């Protein structure tokens, strides 16, 4: 049986994430102490809300250094929504805030308009398609292994991750033509801007692949 540990730090929809992993009979542990992090086989950092609040939650529980150590261990790591954003170096959401620095880059506002110059709704909410990126690696050996191009997943966000190295962008989505990082990857670490646990069969397939790493 595969096992996964989900960080419980007061910011995130833990139950829906846990249920998605339990769908595949995974053993799920909700992590509330630093010691549990390094003993995990796979680690998931969920999150909704503001970047600053998320980092404060991790700091309060003394999770920062154990997360960094886990990420360097080579074991599978997945950040979801805010969790993905916190993987980066910093965020400009309501000020300047330091992130985990697992992947170099910054979190910036989703553009307020499409490529045609027309304003669109912020936050970006709803189903959007996954597209390959020009410099990212092939999906065949990643958590997107069985995902057809242009599969739709569910987004809810006002900010987006911008890795410094475009090769870390595994998949994008286009919001009125504006490219947004949908999946990022650096060796054993993955981040999904969308919610796989809310993305139907496509999201479940991604979760299943993560359990098989």
Curated annotation (Swiss-Prot):
Pathway: Amino-acid biosynthesis; L-histidine biosynthesis; L-histidine from 5-phospho-alpha-D-ribose 1-diphosphate: step 5/9. Its EC number is 4.3.2.10, 3.5.1.2. The active site is at 81 (nucleophile), 195, 197. It holds the Pfam family GATase. One of its GO terms (molecular function) is lyase activity. InterPro entries: Class_I_gatase-like (IPR029062), GATASE (IPR017926), Imidazole-glycPsynth_HisH (IPR010139). Residues 3-213 form the Glutamine amidotransferase type-1 domain. Keywords: Amino-acid biosynthesis, Cytoplasm, Glutamine amidotransferase, Histidine biosynthesis, Hydrolase, Lyase. It is found in: Cytoplasm. One of its GO terms (cellular component) is cytoplasm. GO terms for biological process: L-histidine biosynthetic process. PROSITE patterns: GATASE_TYPE_1. Its main location: cytoplasm. It catalyses: 5-[(5-phospho-1-deoxy-D-ribulos-1-ylimino)methylamino]-1-(5-phospho-beta-D-ribosyl)imidazole-4-carboxamide + L-glutamine = D-erythro-1-(imidazol-4-yl)glycerol 3-phosphate + 5-amino-1-(5-phospho-beta-D-ribosyl)imidazole-4-carboxamide + L-glutamate + H(+); L-glutamine + H2O = L-glutamate + NH4(+). Heterodimer of HisH and HisF. HAMAP family: HisH (MF_00278). IGPS catalyzes the conversion of PRFAR and glutamine to IGP, AICAR and glutamate. The HisH subunit provides the glutamine amidotransferase activity that produces the ammonia necessary to HisF for the synthesis of IGP and AICAR. This is Imidazole glycerol phosphate synthase subunit HisH 1. The gene is hisH1.
